[in-house]
Amino acid sequence: MSGLFSSVGRKGLFLIDPEKAHGLSVAALKSGFLPTCMVPHDPRLQQTVAGLVFPNPLGMAAGYDKNAEVPGPLLRLGFGFTEIGTVTPRAQSGNPKPRIFRLVEDEGVINRLGFNNEGHAAALERLTQARLRGIVGVNIGANKDSEDRIADYVQGIEAFYAVASYFTVNISSPNTPGLRDLQARESLAALLTAVLERRKTEAERLGKRIPIFLKIAPDLTEEGLDDVAEEALAHDLDGLIVSNTTLSREGLRPGPHRGEAGGLSGKPLFELSTTVLAKMRRRVGANLPIIGVGGVSSAETALEKVRAGADLVQLYSCMVYEGPGLPSAIVKGMSKLVAREGVETIRDLRDSAVDRWADRKLG
């Protein structure tokens, strides 16, 4: 599928507006047009993280399936888990179009979508009806015009508690004004306290404890990373997701869209996001789970995230360039790489490159 996509499908899709092309890809998944890409079960890739058993460590990041339209078809592409959202309490249209830009020269994407989604009710109805057996996380956010953003996150926990495999508290999108301010220490402490208190209430009501992850930006300073790490460890948080898109444009090749406002993802994000991942692993120690995101485009880059401290990895933007066969190719490639290393489990490779990445300077 990836080869066919590279030679034929990509050229056709790239003639279409990126947002329309995304809609077509979702429609193709919904219709069953794309074939299932089965990956062989490899016990060396299976991971138990935050109490959940992941068949393999590769997940679809939030942002692709905003409204929970295709979690099942995504899992059938070979992903070990998927994440819907970001969803906000009320539907919102996001920022004006155009708002997605391909950086073909760099195999990157700039987006300034602004949490466009159909709201809690629509996504909840789809997840409830789907009754999926796989791991499906719910990425929750706040409405742009919300007067109480912390309350929006609390509402997300309450709304999806019965159907979410895990939650991601997304406070790191650069496209909602002021959202990243919630990463400041006092604001973060208040947010985590409120969200985790709601989790406690829902756990008592429904008799199950759903893991909660915090998704952070790659643009934090060393001091900002200190604050996030200390608050994460001070609260009953289940893990971190590192990282969201970046505002940096360092290293981009000349191109028509490199100056567009928004968050940069894809291959250009790999080094920065992996550096921040390793710095966070060094700060939080060995026990707090971390999901590594940003620039994963191959089995080698996925495994490098693990070496830099990730328990699991996610991708999205690189599939724009490689096609729907990418997840199965990565999982199969990771199996071969782990076998070559001669280890019993991929976990044995985690942290082996933390120092090399964490010693890099930011900015």
From Swiss-Prot:
Comment on bound cofactor: Binds 1 FMN per subunit.
Reactions that this protein is recorded to catalyse: (S)-dihydroorotate + a quinone = orotate + a quinol
Molecular-function GO term, any one: dihydroorotate dehydrogenase (quinone) activity
UniProt keyword list: Cell membrane, Flavoprotein, FMN, Membrane, Oxidoreductase, Pyrimidine biosynthesis
Enzyme class: oxidoreductase
EC number: 1.3.5.2
Membrane topology: Peripheral membrane protein
Listed SUPFAM superfamilies: FMN-linked oxidoreductases
Cofactor: FMN
Annotated positions binding FMN: A62, G63, Y64, D65, K66, T86, N139, N170, K215, S243, G266, G295, Y316, S317
This protein's GO CC annotations: cytoplasm; plasma membrane
Location relative to the cell: Cell membrane
Keyword Oxidoreductase recorded: yes
Residue numbers annotated as active site: S173
Main location, first listed in the record: membrane
Pathway: Pyrimidine metabolism; UMP biosynthesis via de novo pathway; orotate from (S)-dihydroorotate (quinone route): step 1/1
Family stated for the protein in its record: Belongs to the dihydroorotate dehydrogenase family. Type 2 subfamily.
Self-association state and partner proteins as the record states: Monomer.
Protein role: Catalyzes the conversion of dihydroorotate to orotate with quinone as electron acceptor.
Protein name: Dihydroorotate dehydrogenase (quinone)
